[in-house]
From Swiss-Prot:
Component of a CRL2 E3 ubiquitin-protein ligase complex, also named ECS (Elongin BC-CUL2/5-SOCS-box protein) complex, composed of CUL2, Elongin BC (ELOB and ELOC), RBX1 and substrate-specific adapter KLHDC10. Interacts (via the 6 Kelch repeats) with PPP5C. Residues 15-36 have a biased composition (Gly residues). The lineage of its organism: Eukaryota, Metazoa, Chordata, Craniata, Vertebrata. It comes from the Eukaryota. This is Kelch domain-containing protein 10. Pathway: Protein modification; protein ubiquitination. Pfam families: Kelch_4, Kelch_KLHDC2_KLHL20_DRC7. It is found in: Nucleus; Cytoplasm.
Length: 410
């Protein structure tokens, strides 16, 4: 544990924003391969660090990421190791005030130069992708809990420009470790911590009117979810589901989950169904969560004793838990994960060893659905012709590539 994290733990109730606890962790190696054998199999991506000007991002935790068909976007993060975080070249040490993209087609990392004001709350913020726009809310700087945010920053990844949304209404407190989802044109924000107390507050930002509203559910206080941070949320358009999370001294169970009903404005408690032989997933916080239609996938995290390396699927219609036949090569927490529209999940960074306070910069991918024939053919083509992106648009069209595939090369 770093001195900053120890200070944070001892000084207040609120949790750390990017790692730090006690326990053990495991690590391993990763293999590769293409085709249907990739389903439920982690593949480590080394990138192309030999290309000039294309170093990979340093190891970090507490960052967030999103993905489209073409890129993985990684924002922010924290690493108390002075050398690993860039040494004298990093003016924001131990934070990373930077935006990276990993280009799937070429395997190249690129630190994006942007205009406008990039937020300084760089640990345990919330991040969603809305069209070409990254929407960033909340987060904290250093010391954790002393410089929190409650603004919504927008970065258009096409024009590489940051802007601040001008919002009215009852906005959330300055928090970090909250969870956020984009549902029917509105941002919903639940939970988090100020650094002193944990929250059960639920807020909604209408992106058409730019008005914040604090939602007041029709429940007794005893029926509300427990206060928490570093949880994840999923939704089906009618309900928002709260998955895990905790405080600096506990992690919440996944046997039962709370769901906020958007139609009735009330919290409900839903009993999930265990895996037939294994039971329920372990309680956890600081895990990752991605969603494909009605299937929700949680990965990694910390249960108060060990760093977890498992991956589970929850169906939002049956509430059945299924443990996938895959184990993370590096069990992590305070990592980030995102899924592409095609169903491939990417996992980056996180804390891999608590005692040594060690972070990783590793990037892994895993197909959560059977890849389509188009995706299989695309991966085969990129493997056979790694310099395809260097050809002109005219040459690519002449080779028979569609406009959609050509866009994924740029």
């Amino acid at each position: 544990m770093s001195a900053a994290q120890g200070w944070d733990r001892n000084r207040r109730r609120g949790g750390g924003a990017a790692g730090g606890a006690s326990g053990v962790s495991g690590a391993g190696a990763a293999g590769g391969g293409r085709g249907t054998g990739q389903l439920n199999r982690f593949v480590q991506l080394s990138g192309r660090p030999h290309l000039p000007g294309h170093r990979p991002p340093p190891a970090r935790s507490g960052h967030r990421c999103v993905a489209d068909n073409t890129n993985l976007y990684v924002f922010g993060g924290y690493n108390p190791d002075y050398d690993e975080s860039g040494g004298p070249d990093n003016e924001d040490y131990p934070l990373f005030r930077e935006l990276w993209r990993y280009h799937f087609a070429t395997g190249v990392w690129h630190q994006m130069g942007t205009d406008g004001y990039m937020p300084r709350e760089l640990a345990s913020m919330s991040l969603v992708l809305h069209g070409n726009n990254l929407l960033v809310f909340g987060g904290t700087g250093i010391p954790f809990g002393e410089s929190n945010g409650n603004d919504v920053h927008v970065c258009n990844v096409k024009y590489k420009r940051w802007a601040l949304l001008s919002c009215r209404g009852k906005r959330p407190s300055r928090i970090y470790g909250q969870a956020m989802a984009l549902i029917n044109g509105s941002l919903y924000v639940f939970g988090g911590t100020t650094g002193y107390i944990y929250s059960t507050d639920l807020h909604k930002l209408d992106l058409n009117t730019m008005v914040w509203t604090q939602l007041k559910p029709n429940n007794l206080s005893c029926d509300l979810p427990e206060e928490r941070y570093r949880h994840e949320i999923a939704h089906d358009g009618q309900r928002i589901y709260i998955l895990g999370g905790g405080t600096s001294w506990t992690a919440y169970s996944l046997n039962k989950i709370h769901a906020y009903n958007l139609e009735t404005n009330a919290w409900e408690e839903i009993a999930t169904k265990p895996h037939e032989k294994i039971g329920f997933p372990a309680a956890r916080r600081c895990h990752s969560c991605v969603q494909i239609k009605n299937d929700v996938f949680i990965c990694g995290g910390y249960n108060g004793e060990v760093i977890l390396g498992d991956i589970w699927k929850l169906n939002l219609q049956t509430f059945q838990w299924v443990k996938l036949p895959a184990t993370m090569p590096e069990p992590v927490y305070f990592h980030c994960a995102a899924v592409t529209p095609a169903g491939c999940m990417y996992i980056h960074g996180g804390v891999v060893n608590i005692h040594e306070n060690k972070r990783t910069g590793s990037l892994f991918k895993i197909w959560l659905v059977v890849p389509s024939l188009l995706e299989l053919a695309w991966e085969k083509l990129l493997a056979a012709f790694p310099n395809l992106a260097n050809l002109s648009r005219t040459q690519l069209l002449h080779l028979g590539l569609t406009q959609e595939l050509i866009e994924r090369l740029k």
